[in-house]
């Protein structure tokens, strides 16, 4: 495993107080975060979200995607249970990087959908590697998870990596006129679920 736990600190949020744990992928010099609420060391399945970094949605409040809305909803759902884990997966733009994401946005402005834009730039539909997230679960000794996701690929990869995903929990947020085509593409071309 090429992942190391580096440091931790308290992180108060509007929804609750988390323990923020920093990890580093040693071969890629890439950092990731685990935000822990409550005791996740028991055998009871942990409500968990793997949230891939989206600077435009998470920090700049973009309406082009549902990422920022999903992040807030995940924090809220975890805090309602008073126990959970949010992994902030630092693979921006489905792991094509911020500048390539801006290039993909420009192609979308010209009529391409999110999948077509990635392909036109020479990338796969989704370049993310969720094995690093599986390794975070293992380092934190999480026995079983209830995964907050609409993405069946996350579940498939985590199970393949030996993570006990006992339930998929829907993460449904409101759409808006700016992201309806994006959400439709995620459903129709990427197989995402959008029903509870």
From Swiss-Prot:
InterPro entries: GTP_cyclohydro_II (IPR032677), RibA (IPR000926), RibA-like_sf (IPR036144)
GO cellular component terms attached to this protein's record: cytosol
Enzyme Commission number(s): 3.5.4.25
Keywords from the named record: GTP-binding, Hydrolase, Metal-binding, Nucleotide-binding, Riboflavin biosynthesis, Zinc
Cofactors: Zn(2+)
Annotated residues for binding of Zn(2+): 54, 65, 67
A Pfam family this chain is assigned to: GTP_cyclohydro2
UniProt binding sites for GTP: 49-53, 70, 92-94, 114, 149, 154
Reaction catalyzed: GTP + 4 H2O = 2,5-diamino-6-hydroxy-4-(5-phosphoribosylamino)-pyrimidine + formate + 2 phosphate + 3 H(+)
Pathway in which this enzyme or protein is active: Cofactor biosynthesis; riboflavin biosynthesis; 5-amino-6-(D-ribitylamino)uracil from GTP: step 1/4
GO biological process: riboflavin biosynthetic process
Active site per the UniProt annotation: 126 (proton acceptor), 128 (nucleophile)
UniProt remark on cofactor binding: Binds 1 zinc ion per subunit.
GO molecular function: GTP binding; GTP cyclohydrolase II activity; zinc ion binding
Function noted in UniProt: Catalyzes the conversion of GTP to 2,5-diamino-6-ribosylamino-4(3H)-pyrimidinone 5'-phosphate (DARP), formate and pyrophosphate.
Similarity comment: Belongs to the GTP cyclohydrolase II family.
Subunit structure: Homodimer.
Protein known as: GTP cyclohydrolase-2
Organism encoding this protein: Hamiltonella defensa subsp. Acyrthosiphon pisum (strain 5AT)
